[in-house]
Amino acid sequence: MRISKVAGYILISILVISFSVTSIYVFYQQGNKDSKEKFFFGVSYGQNTVEDAKIIIDKVKNYTNLFIINSFPISTNNTDSEVLNEICDYAAKSDLYFIVYFFSFLQRIGDWQQEWVIDAKQNWGEKFLGVYLRDEPGGRQFEEGDVIKNASSYSEATENFVSTISTSFSMDFLKKKCIPVFTSDFVLYYYDYLSGYDTVFAEFGWNNSRIRQVGLCRGASKMLKKDWGAIITWTYTQPPYLGSGTEIYADMITAYDAGAKYVVMFDYEKENQKGILTEEHFLAMEKFWEYVSSNSNKEKIKAQVAYILPNYYGWGMRHPDDKIWGIWDADEKSSIIWENLNKLETKYGLLLDIIYDDPQYDIKESYDQTFVWNATIN
């Protein structure tokens, strides 16, 4: 009888433990599934204090679900995580998901950042989406030669760019800890993904073609089975800095309708506590959130046509004389590609992806129609 009771208690204990483990597994699987399927919209916060962060969060929390803490002083200069923790707590309590910018995880930069990231998922659960690692890796290569100074060929430049970033201490650290890695950029999206980034935000700013930015970033993410988004950023170097409310609303709609998983409004420290965002921009954001809520079941625009660039051809494509890998001047292929891109963008708009002739991917299976870079296009 005693043996039967003991066996019964053991059986009950096993069932309870099994149920608990299963429940925890299902909870995290459901959380991951939910964030996988969600659309995220929010602000990239570029200021430096808890007070200012709370002001922005209170302003936008009813029509956003994402907050990016994009502040070098908060995540790198501070000697401890107190400020960052308070902002993350406030964002999570406001029912916002959040991403945190870090410049590096080397101990010489700081001694708390590594531990903070390791503990973040436990502290905030699914609200912590990942790390925004540095900024504009492709753009910095073009403007500063940040990754590679010299190379003998386009293929060598590609290999050096990808290997330098992918094997860096910070990228390696995040990958080993299974932390999703984000960045934003305006060139070389495909090579950002190859370097280890899980999500890249295409920068909608200046006079850059939105169709081209979408085609390059969405096309790269599709080839590599990654996520993509758009960040609405600088239009001017002086006030008002950003486009009008009407202009940024149009950019948000373009990104959302084209299938972006993330749409972000860039903000930056300036004279007032709300940075460069004005009431006009907040009204446009609220209007966009209403559009998203009303069109959540609307089928997104999927690319049907692909324009195939030569492999390793890291041309900026912002203007006809743009650099290649930030090292070489435009070559004989550049003018052909420029002309063809203009024709295809006019004809197909957001139905166009711009991808690379990488032999490891079956490109033709993914699109109804493809054009190689030097095709004759009428």
What are these regions (language model features)?
Residues G8, T22-N378:
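Glycan-processing catalytic domains of CAZymes
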Residues M1-S18, T22-F27:
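N-terminal Sec-pathway targeting helices
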